[in-house]
UniProtKB/Swiss-Prot annotation:
PANTHER family membership: RNI-LIKE SUPERFAMILY PROTEIN
Domain FBD residues, every copy: 122-199
Origin species: Arabidopsis thaliana (Mouse-ear cress)
Alphabetical list of InterPro entries matching this protein: FBD (IPR006566), FBL60-like (IPR055294)
Protein name per Swiss-Prot or TrEMBL: FBD domain-containing protein At3g58975
Highest taxon of the lineage: Eukaryota
Amino acid sequence: MKALFEARINFIVTEKQIKRVRAPNEDWLQDDEVDVVLRFSNVVKLMNGIQNVQKLYLTADTIEVLSLCCESVPLFNNLKTLGITSEEGRGWQAMPVLGLLHYMTDKCGDACDCISREDKGRSLTSCPVKKLEIRGFRGTMKEMTMIKHFLVYFPCLKEMNIYVEEYDPTELRFPQVSKVIIQMMEEYNKLSSCNVQLLITDYLSEKWTAAGRIL
């Protein structure tokens, strides 16, 4: 897979499987539960095999599994575009290589309050990523903090597209919250050379228009 240009990784897991993987060393794990842990432990080989890709897209479940099963992630020297999906209840912000926030899991990245100020952002400073996509955005302050972290520490980042969650209720359903989020996005654009865009799909646009809402 050395010549692979683009990779989209989506591990399909259940809540029960995530719970098992989060506690792989517990004595009470039954044989079928141990099999789940062992199966996900092979993801290290997968990541090593795709480390030359230029475009990489990871779902929330995938990043949760990576953060729990991989002690380290290979350096993606050729990576230009990174797409990640945010999902409530998943540790998408627990992937240390991205410097993400400690939230749902017992591992944290260098944006976390657990990390000293001088060490924050260290894992991103040599990253060549120029474009970042975030999907499933819900308008929370945790997400906004993470977005600011990316803007500060990704040296090559030129474009960030943030897609609002389509189906589930988000904080953006409240007009006051939407106004604050838009103001913060505008401020991020002023302070950074990166073009930050908050985007909605056609489906969500039609849905909000029918409800008399405008972002």
